Each structure stands twice: as structure tokens, then as C-alpha cells.
Amino acid sequence: PGYYLPTRTGNILRAAERRPADKYGLDTIICWPRLWPALPDTHRTDLLAARTSLDTAATTTLWALLFSAYTPYTLLAIPLALAIATLTVTLVIPSRAQAFGDLIEAAYDTHRTTLYTQLRWPLPSTPADEKAAGQALTAYLWRGSDHTTPTFTQPNP
């Protein structure tokens, strides 16, 4: 209940943000700045393209609404602007948000072990251990730790 947002797009993006935490214990907000540099260029390019596409759709909506200011010049401005804004908000933006969210989730699905390795954090040994390990890594990145466990792994030569 506390995760719902007022718009469909907000809920799509929130769900994409929550899935890595639900599956792997990795908080997207805290871990993302550390995962981003570890992603291959192809994945980063895809993410940037999806984000740009989402931003462009949002900008189109704004411009459509601003276009309605031309009402004194033509009466068609309001219905045309509202039609474009409505279509963009109800169809285009949610589909682009879904594509962007899917790529974020895929980044965690396929590159989370790289995150552990680059931070010299021990990899979880089983899928059952992964959520607790992810929560511990997230807590360490968020607040640091003065515990003696876990022991950092040695970097590969």
C-alpha cells in the first residue's frame, strides 16, 4: 500500500524500482550509482535511449498543453492539444516507462554479481541467501559498517 503513486506511470517506475529489492535485496536507489559504471556500454546505451524516449514523451505532453495557449488564434488549438496530451499520457508515456523499467530490472538481473565483485563483497552462495546478502550490501553502502563480517574478497589480479 505504501508503494502506490497517483499515476500509472509512477506506479510502473516504482514497480521497476522495487523489483530488485524484492528479488535480490538490493535497493535500487542506493545501489544504482555503483552499478551504472559497471554496466557494459551496450546496456548503458540502451538505458540512455529508453530514458531519452521517456523524457521526449513527457516533453511532448508539456508542449501539447502549451499549444492550447494559441486558442485566441484558432479554436482547434484546445481539442488538438488535449487529444495529443491525452494520447501521450495514457499510451505513450506508460509504454516507454515500462521499457525503461524493464531495462533497469534487466541490469540488476544480469549484472548484480559484477556489483558484488567490484565492491569486493562476497557473492551469495545460494539463491536463498541472496536476498539477505543484498540487504546487507545495501545497508553497508547506505550507512557503512564497523562489523567484522562479511570479509571482503580479494580483487582479481
Positions of the model-derived regions?
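Transmembrane alpha-helical segments and their cytosolic interface motifs
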Residues: 19-79
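Cytosolic/nucleoplasmic, non-transmembrane interface domains of endomembrane
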Residues: 1-29
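Sequence-level detector for tyrosine residue identity
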Residues: 3-4, 24, 70-73, 108, ...
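Cytosolic/matrix-facing juxtamembrane and C-terminal tails of multi-pass cellular membrane proteins
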Residues: 44-51, 87-157
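Transmembrane alpha-helical hairpins and terminal membrane-anchor modules
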Residues: 57-105, 109
